[in-house]
Amino acid sequence: MKVAIIGATGYGGIELIRLLEQHPYFSIASLHSFSQVGEFITNVYPHFRNVLVHTLQEIDAEKIEKEAEIVFLATPAGVSAELTPKLLAVGLKVIDLSGDFRMIDPSSYELWYKRPAAQEELLRKAVYGLSEWKRPEIQNANLIANPGCFATAALLAVAPLVRSGIIEEASIIIDAKSGVSGAGKTPTTMTHFPELYDNLHIYKVNQHQHVPEIEQMLTEWNRETKPITFSTHLIPISRGIMITLYAKVKEEMKIEQLQKLYEETYEYSAFVRVRSQGEFPSPKEVRGSNYCDIGIAYDERTERVTVVSVIDNMMKGAAGQAVQNANLLAGLEETTGLQHMPLYP
């Protein structure tokens, strides 16, 4: 099956290229850029030499439709909202890595993203692509909104607790840390080497745009869920996310019960690895892979659960999950082309 990538020169775009070029079923028909049309992708990224021969093309929906069946949008917020109607109109299926179609309520998007929302009809039709929890919907979708990186790690961590109803609905606290690639390719003062090396930054306190998509899914799982407390930090690694999540249980429990809950929940999810009791993951242990590793602890004294989850923000947090969703969309085994062992050390 032929695919196209729009926004091919960003970090999400080049990770899609890496995965799709090695995929046994998908093949890249075309790569598209806004600012570097006519350039060979190998001139922009020399590490693709002797692997790719593509020239970056302008964006023409009708031309893309003649070459591809699925389009990946690795574009900034606001851009996908403009492009997607044109792509859908010519019969293409769209997997969008931006936040433009993640929220059903347009006012929620406008509040958190500070820009106009996409067409309301498309917001209602878009499927939120949290692969492990939306498989049937993804398989029948025309438009998939790939989840945010923080949202993916947080939702996989908290899903068993919320869906089982064992935690107090207003008790969820999420402490999130991300590698610098999560901030995108464009450099800023905060991502500048002298500012970040041997340092860390907290940013967007109580204002991160992934909050509403997390809360939207929590409410779908449990209507009684209340707003969460969510903080994000930038740490001096290139890839990786670590979520530390805290919640208070309604009734006294044992760690063995929680361990069993997580193991049973993700028993048939190939990319979610629940650590043995007392073990906790680190971001390096999933680097370059589509895995989400989870560890659980329980404090009987405070009756609080602590859940630690880690992902590679460029893989399970972006391109990897997008390809996982494309596999589901194409009727393939969802692990196809994604069975990479983590890069370690």
Curated annotation (Swiss-Prot):
GO terms for molecular function: N-acetyl-gamma-glutamyl-phosphate reductase activity; NAD binding; NADP+ binding. Its main location: cytoplasm. CDD domains: AGPR_1_C, AGPR_1_N. Keywords: Amino-acid biosynthesis, Arginine biosynthesis, Cytoplasm, NADP, Oxidoreductase. It comes from the Bacteria. Its EC number is 1.2.1.38. SMART domains: Semialdhyde_dh. Pathway: Amino-acid biosynthesis; L-arginine biosynthesis; N(2)-acetyl-L-ornithine from L-glutamate: step 3/4. GO terms for biological process: L-arginine biosynthetic process. It is found in: Cytoplasm. Belongs to the NAGSA dehydrogenase family. Type 1 subfamily. Catalyzes the NADPH-dependent reduction of N-acetyl-5-glutamyl phosphate to yield N-acetyl-L-glutamate 5-semialdehyde. This is N-acetyl-gamma-glutamyl-phosphate reductase. It comes from Bacillus mycoides (strain KBAB4) (Bacillus weihenstephanensis). The lineage of its organism: Bacteria, Bacillati, Bacillota, Bacilli, Bacillales. The gene is argC.
